[in-house]
């Protein structure tokens, strides 16, 4: 989560409203923050009263940064907050959580760009479909699945269609809160 060490380069102000949306649903919730970077979603959820935060990122530096940011926001002082972290490939980590039978009230999936070139768009859409499938297996019934795409080459309607197609294949009815 720094220009020198990661794909993502810091705090993304364009996600400010989305972090607030997640926080609005986080009181007493269990929250999975996938591709967590500096933990913007995790920190907001913790500050709003989440009971469990589980972060996943490929970068050990990012996971350390989440801990630093939680401490800076005094979230770690809450005795009722459990913080778990996984350093590793997000797809593999999510699959392991599925195998372990884990479920969360809120699942946040905010990956780096999957389509640096136009030729990568089909692969990126398949990755979003796979993330949706995993997210649906990890979110509790009635929970919040939050997905984002920062791939400028992915048309918003194609992204939404991909998410909804996977939900249909899984037999899950989605209710969009916000686009």
Regions found by a protein language model. Give the residues of each.
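SAM-dependent Rossmann-like transferase core, predominantly class I methyltransferases
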Residues: 1-29
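Conserved SAM-binding loop of SAM-dependent methyltransferases across substrates and taxa
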Residues: 38-51
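Conserved SAM-binding motif I beta-strand of class I
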Residues: 52-57
